[in-house]
């Protein structure tokens, strides 16, 4: 870990289906696809472990070379304010708060239990998506609903993409030579899911996602902020079945819902700029505008901003989105350099002019490194 070197990377897809497969890459070498039916997470991790020790594809000689396993866990609720070593008590608590994010949380637990079954003595660490945001003050995380609902059901803003916001905010300060604990930063993690965070003097003071990852800015298939009265109105007009509401707000809305084209920004940009489709163009304007509004709001919340960071798949690759968000904000101290921005992909780069009061920078995220570093730190103790 002293070198932060990636020995291998990959992932298993379609667990539980006949056409499940493992994507594997040894270092920077050729990518391999191993097709094998994996009925559950235990079988998936068995294949991962056998691949890591394989004579041709592997990077370790035996499983004893593995010192620990780190897990990205969606939700830590109010119980986990930082990464923790996993034990039976932690597993029970993760399961207890699973209703806050049932799909992801149960999958996270399956991975933890599979490792425990296969390598029972191996230390495991949980790194929570929500933990970095636990410094948000109560006036920012509470919803304006009866307080008893917060007390009974823990309904509040939690925020997500925590490892990404943590990594890129610190890395941006390293690149710019700024003291992280004396800097006001707005981080924009923009991918198919998107969230912003306001970080003041090393602590998150607000973030755009809420109880679930659906709140906040417009996303690929999620609606983001919406008047909740829309839903009883749709129900009363038989335009939406209450049973379909979750699917409606999470999978049918956002850029996909408005454009009618795709949730993939590349497809939508082609429709807007090449085929001149009005709905596609509208969805892009809405997307940029809503992110820009949050940038302005967080500047107000912190009484200023020193650094604006773009990351995530679109934030790292999408010069059109970065332009739409950061241009024409001169009165807020942002002098955007579109010459540097245009065509920039997957590189650490300052994209504001030297005279800009607010530095704008692209920082590719590295959530896996955060998980590895936290795992190392906790298992070294």
For the regions a language model picked out, list residue spans one by one.
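Short beta-strand-loop/turn "lid" adjacent to the catalytic site in phosphate-handling enzymes
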Residues: 52, 56-104, 125, 131-142
């Amino acid at each position: 870990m002293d070198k932060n070197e990636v020995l291998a990377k990959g992932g298993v897809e379609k667990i539980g289906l006949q056409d499940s497969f493992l994507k594997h890459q040894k270092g920077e070498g050729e990518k391999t696809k191993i097709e094998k039916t994996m009925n559950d997470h235990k079988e998936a991790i068995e294949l991962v472990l056998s691949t890591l020790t394989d004579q041709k594809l592997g990077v370790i000689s035996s499983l004893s070379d593995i010192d620990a396993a780190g897990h990205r866990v969606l939700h830590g609720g109010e119980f986990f304010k930082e990464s923790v070593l996993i034990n039976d008590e932690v597993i029970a608590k993760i399961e207890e708060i699973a209703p806050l994010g049932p799909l992801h949380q149960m999958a996270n637990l399956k991975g933890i239990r599979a490792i425990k079954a296969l390598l029972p003595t191996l230390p495991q660490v949980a790194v929570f998506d929500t933990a970095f945001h636990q410094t948000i003050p109560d006036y920012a995380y509470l919803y304006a609903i009866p307080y008893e609902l917060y007390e009974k059901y823990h309904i509040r803003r939690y925020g997500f993409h925590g490892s990404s916001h943590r990594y890129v905010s610190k890395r941006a300060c390293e690149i710019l030579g700024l003291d992280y604990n004396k800097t006001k930063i707005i981080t924009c993690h923009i991918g198919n899911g998107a969230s912003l965070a306001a970080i003041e003097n090393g602590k998150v003071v607000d973030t755009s996602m809420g109880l679930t990852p659906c709140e906040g800015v417009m996303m690929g298939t999620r609606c983001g902020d919406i008047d909740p009265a829309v839903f009883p109105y749709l129900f009363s007009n038989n335009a939406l079945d209450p049973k379909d509401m979750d699917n409606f707000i999470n999978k049918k809305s956002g850029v996909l819902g408005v454009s009618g084209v795709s949730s993939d920004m590349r497809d939508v940009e082609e429709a807007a700029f090449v085929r001149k489709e009005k709905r596609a163009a509208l969805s892009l304007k809405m997307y940029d505008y809503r992110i820009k509004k949050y940038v302005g709001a967080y500047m107000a919340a912190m009484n200023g901003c020193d650094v604006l960071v773009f990351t995530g798949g679109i934030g790292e690759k999408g010069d059109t989105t970065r332009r739409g968000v950061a241009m024409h904000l001169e009165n807020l101290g942002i002098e955007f350099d579109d010459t540097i921005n245009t065509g920039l992909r997957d590189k650490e780069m300052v994209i504001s002019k030297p005279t800009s009061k607010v530095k704008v920078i692209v920082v590719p995220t590295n959530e896996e490194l955060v998980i590895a570093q936290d795992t190392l730190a906790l298992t070294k103790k």
